[in-house]
Amino acid sequence: MNSRQRVLKAVNFEKPDRVPIDLGAVRPSGMNAIVYDKLKKRMGINTPTKIRHTMQILAQIEPEVLDRLHIDTIPLDVNSAAWAQMDAHKGLKKKLFCGLEVYFAPQTKFKEQPDGSWVLLNASGDVFGRMPKDGFYFDFTRPTMASKKIDPKLFKPRDTVSDEELDTLAKQAKNLYENTDKAIIGWGANINLVGLSSLSADNITQGSLDEWLCMLMVEKETANEMMDRYVDAVIKCLELYHQAVGDYCFAWGIAGDDAGTQRSELMAPELFAEMIKPHYKRLCHWVHTNTNWKTFLHSCGSIYNFIPHWIEAGIDILNPVQISAANMEPERLMKDFGGKIVFWGGGCDTQKVLPLGTPEQVRDHVKHNISIFASGTGGYVFNQVHNIQQNVPVENVEAMFETAYEYCKKVCQ
């Protein structure tokens, strides 16, 4: 059974020859470039490290590393696709504060500030990100937007995709499908309904989150109209993506919608069911009616009480399964939702165990989680909870993937 077959078995609730393993198939399942560079050097791989996602300084995971770690998945998004078709040395070379030399996409624009920080500029030359001196990530900087009221008239979600992006994705999808056996996940034009508070269009939160949450309660008609426009726009983009890549992808990331905190959901489940769920249902219905894709949702935090609503709305796959959050224990999730939704993640806690534990503690933790999530027939893909951070000991990363491979085989025997 090859990787693509293995993943398809798992997401269709059939028993694979081993539990599939993911690293970097979507942006929130990857690895910071600093620890990635350490890991691949221990493998004897000395190639330049490319940055796939600038804000988070996420590495572009190379094919040799994917194979060495027994990874079954591979991403399809415009950032990774463009990089895959380009030699690293054509990128923008820059040293991170730790001294590591990496390559950013050629169009990346930085500006160093007098205080030693870096700011990130968009195509118009406006600052939209800042990394403090000696920092590891860029933070979004939108103080003027956050201080203004939401104006629904100005909310104009992007409803088209450039020919250049579609052409890049089409070529890369064909290349990945024909020259690898890995399962391909598409990512782009995903919705953010729980966190939607916009002065202009994008799939990232702008303006005031608390104002948007209040609108969901007291300005329901306006909020619904905005979400209708959002879903309409996303469907138009997904239609273009599907025309470009078709069935080369088995799933598409339709939503990056962080709906929980460490302790609870961001709103009452009843409000979610009334205001948010219908829009998810319409989007999922379009995907399932017009494509063969599985619907992939990324949502961090304690989201236990939203999961049944997402299942009813048509979400097929849930990531990152933040097991360290309240009510998100593997046993509870499998007892209540096993066989109803694919859990993609939850394999290793990245808040405490992976960065702070010993390799042996990591191994025991990974074995326990796999034994629970893989206790049914299919329905599970191993992935750590969200991205592996820069301060994680590389020995722990090795322990996690070694144990995952060994134990993912064992539980399927």
Model regions and ranges:
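Active-site loop segments of alpha/beta catalytic cores
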Residues: 1-40, 45-51, 131-132, 140-413
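Generic structural hydrophobic/aromatic packing signal, biased to beta-strands
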Residues: 21, 66, 74, 110, ...
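Segments that shape or occlude catalytic/ligand-binding pockets
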Residues: 36-84
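Short, charge-rich binding segments
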Residues: 64-68, 100-101, 110-111, 175-179
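Short, glycine/charge-rich beta-strand/loop segments that flank catalytic centers
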Residues: 75-90, 188-193
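Repeat-unit-sized solenoid/scaffold elements
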Residues: 89-116, 260-262, 266-267, 319-322, ...
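A gly/proline- and charged-residue-enriched helix-loop-helix capping module
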Residues: 93-169
